Amino acid sequence: MLQCKTSQQPIIDEQKTAITDTIQKDSLQVELLIPQDTVKQDSTPQKLTSRQLQLLKIEEKISCFQSLQKEKEINLKYPGKLLKKGDSGITIIPIKRKLQLLGLLKQDSLTIRFDSTMEAAVKNFQQMHNIRTDGIPGRNTFRFLSWPISKYINTLENYRENMSKKVDSLPTTLIEINIPEYSLRIYDNDSLLKQFKVIVGKYKTQTPILNSEVDYLVFNPCWTVPHKIAIKNMLPRMKRDTNYLDDRNMFITQNGTRVNHKAIDFSSCSKDNFPYKIYQNASPGNALGKVKFMFDNPYSVYLHDTPSQYLFKRDFRAFSNGCIRVENALELAQLMLNTDQNKAIIKNKLAKGYPVKVYLNEPVSIIIKYETVRYNEQLDLMQFFYDCYGLDK
C-alpha cells in the first residue's frame, strides 16, 4: 500500500501519555480527541475507538500524500486496450511510474515489461480503490490512476472534517451502509458480523442519507411499482406487448380495485393519463426477491433482495431507483432475527408463498451514509471510492 513512515497502531496508556489528548508520531502530531476521564487510572492499555483510529489514519495519509506533491504529477489516460502480465511496450512505463509514486512498486522496476511484480502492484492499487483485484488495469482502474495527488488530499481532508463532527458512541447492533463503497456492514456488540455488497440508487434516483431503525422484515414481498417506473419503463412495453404483465406475474388496480388489464387500451394512456397501480406478486422473479427490510423514512426506501445477483459482480453498482439491493439478503435476515431457529423460521415463512411480516424483537439501527474514503481496519488499508453522486466537493 502507500508507503509512509509510521509507527505501530497506538494505544492509550496512562503511564506513557501522562493523560494527554495528543500522540506524537515521528514528526506528526495527531489530535485524538480523548477526554481525560476516559483514561483508566491503571497501566491497562485502552484501545482507540473506531472514530479515533479513523482520524489517526487520516492524518497519517494526508501527511503521506502531501509529501508526494513535490513530485512531478503523472497524468494517465486509458490506452484503449487491456494490458496484462506478459505484455510489453512504452505504455507500461507511465503506469509503473504512478504505482512507484504511490509506493506500490519498487524504484528499480521501471521496465517496459508487465511482469508479476507490476501485476501485484496493480492488484494492491485496485484493492486500495475497492474494485476487482484482477491485476489488469482496465477502464475502472484507470479511472483512479488518473487521480492527481491533490484529489487524494482533498478527499481525505473532507473526510477528516466529517469525522471530527461525529460521536464515538454508536448503537451496539447496527446496519451501516456506505453508498460510494456499495457496501453494507452489520455489527453486534460493536463487532463486525458480516459485510455484504449492495446496489444503490442511480445518479438521478439517489439513495438518501439517513438514520433510522429496521422494525420488521417481509418474506415473499409483493412489489408495488412506483408510479414513475410504471409510466416511464413499463407503459411503453405494455403498449407493445399484451402479455407483458402476465409474463411477470403482475396485476393492476384502479381506485383500490383489481381490474382486468386485458380490457385496458394502453395505447390511450400517457404519463398524464395513467390512473392505475401495478403490483408484482410474490414469485421467484419478483423484483424484491425473497425478503425486504422495512424502516421508517420519508423517502419510501428500504433494503431488499434481488433475483439479479449477477449485478453484484460489477465494480460500480448504482443501478436502482433509490432502494438498496442486498447480495445474499437471506443471510442478512438470519443475522437480524438472531435466534437459534432463524433458519427454520425463514424456511417456514418462504414456504408459505405469500407475503409474511416478521417483527424483530428489538429494532436494529440503520445508518446510510456517504463517505468516499474509509480506513479498513480488517485490511489495515485506507480505501478510496468513486464519488458516484458528486457530493464530495
Label each region the model flagged.
Residues 1-2:
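Sec-dependent bacterial lipoprotein signal peptides
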Residues 132-140:
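Short, well-structured active-site flanking segments
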